[in-house]
Design a protein with these regions (language model features):
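Histidine-dependent nucleotide/RNA phosphoesterase domain, centered on the 2H-phosphoesterase fold
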Residues: 1-200
């Protein structure tokens, strides 16, 4: 921050993401409730609202950079790419710890790679982008203060009871404002394979 800016920017302008939304899954909600109940005694943790439990699949960019036509084309492209991709069976239960968050790992590794590659191709119109490592996860709590991690790990543990779930769709989501406001809205849903016949 050594140079003066020519103009100020909106820190909280809307962002566009592809998310796998899992807030309606009874299994995911049960695991989140179990973890959040165990961690309720700790300050400095911000819990993900159950409605918005999710797997972040791709950060697309600022919403103002996309026209309605751009978004429509991206969604249509994603639908074509995922039309032959069957719903993915994944297992939740292993707890991941990061200095800034506590999450559930999505296993097995690679189970959702086809979904990510499809939405990435749709967002870039097929242009190649540098490969980025991706560990699919569901964040249960975000850290909002500095505190020792060991008591938190000892209380929650390294693994919760395993649950198997089916991932059958991915959502294009607009996030408005500061992250912790959870001012989200889904503007498109793309089903995987034969699940496209289900009601939206």
């Amino acid at each position: 921050m050594t140079q003066l800016p020519s103009q100020m920017a909106d820190r909280w302008q809307g962002m566009l993401y592809w998310h796998i939304l899992l807030g309606r899954s009874p299994q995911v909600r049960a695991l989140a409730s179990m973890a959040q109940d165990r961690l309720a005694g700790f300050s400095g943790l911000h819990f993900t609202p159950k409605r918005w439990l999710h797997v972040t699949t791709l950060t697309v960019g600022f919403i103002e950079e996309f026209t309605e036509t751009d978004i429509g084309n991206m969604v249509a492209h994603a639908k074509r790419l995922l039309n032959d991709t069957p719903p993915a069976r994944v297992t939740l239960g292993k707890v991941l710890y990061h200095p800034e968050a506590i999450a559930l790992k999505v296993e097995p590794a690679g189970a959702l790679d086809q979904v990510r590659e499809a939405v990435r191709a749709a967002a870039t119109n097929g242009e190649a982008k540098q490969h980025e490592s991706w560990i699919p996860h569901i964040t249960l709590a975000y850290s909002t203060s500095v505190q020792p991690a060991e008591p938190i790990i000892a209380t929650l543990g390294r693994r919760l009871p395993p649950y198997d779930i089916s991932v059958d769709c991915v959502n294009l989501v607009v996030q408005e404002g500061a992250e912790r406001l959870w001012n989200w809205r889904s503007i498109a849903k793309v089903f995987l394979g034969s699940s496209s016949k289900r009601k939206m």
